[in-house]
Amino acid sequence: MAKVESFTLDHTAVKAPYVRLITVETGAKGDKISNFDLRFVQPNENAIPTAGLHTIEHMLAGYLRDHMDGVIDCSPFGCRTGFHLIMWGEHDTTEVATALKASLNDIINASWEDVQGTDIKSCGNYRDHSLFSAQEWCKKILADGISTDPFERKVI
């Protein structure tokens, strides 16, 4: 089985919340994609409940695109401690952390009408959403401060 980078990361050494560049890969035609670890809570100490995480996912899908170009996808980790962010091109952790901070503030200030994809036609699990949970977790993440380094706190 192929080695997966995220399973080689020492989860006991990181200090969440942070943005970490996992890799930049180059395709056959020279196009580059960047993969980031957006870690919201400390691994093995906390996890965001699925309803809040699901709503954060739906809202980040729009808000991150509002704050920076090149977003391909932002998907939650199965462990519920954060997200993978896949982007076209090369970006640094400061740019991503700044856009993430703005996006989390947008979520805090949002109303239910701002949440996209919350009905049976637009979501595969539309019953599992909580804007209240999403907003409370976003407040905590921002209060803890988003670092541009996973091992040393460099809060933006």
Curated annotation (Swiss-Prot):
Q: Which PANTHER family match?
A: S-RIBOSYLHOMOCYSTEINE LYASE
First-tier enzyme category under EC: lyase
Q: What is this protein called?
A: S-ribosylhomocysteine lyase
Binding, Fe cation: H54, H58, C123
Which cysteines link up through disulfide bonds? none
Record-listed E.C. numbers: 4.4.1.21
Of which family is this protein a member? Answer: Belongs to the LuxS family.
Q: From what organism does this protein derive?
A: Ligilactobacillus salivarius (strain UCC118)
How the protein assembles, per its UniProt entry? Homodimer.
* Task of the protein: Involved in the synthesis of autoinducer 2 (AI-2) which is secreted by bacteria and is used to communicate both the cell density and the metabolic potential of the environment. The regulation of gene expression in response to changes in cell density is called quorum sensing. Catalyzes the transformation of S-ribosylhomocysteine (RHC) to homocysteine (HC) and 4,5-dihydroxy-2,3-pentadione (DPD).
Gene Ontology process terms (BP)? quorum sensing
What's in the keyword line of the UniProt record? Autoinducer synthesis, Iron, Lyase, Metal-binding, Quorum sensing
> What remark does the entry make about the cofactor?
Binds 1 Fe cation per subunit.
Q: What molecular functions are annotated in GO for this chain?
A: iron ion binding; S-ribosylhomocysteine lyase activity
Q: Which reaction does it catalyse?
A: S-(5-deoxy-D-ribos-5-yl)-L-homocysteine = (S)-4,5-dihydroxypentane-2,3-dione + L-homocysteine
Cofactor(s) the protein requires to work? Fe cation
The answer to whether UniProt assigns keyword Iron to this entry is: yes
Query: Which Pfam families does this UniProt record tie to the protein?
Result: LuxS
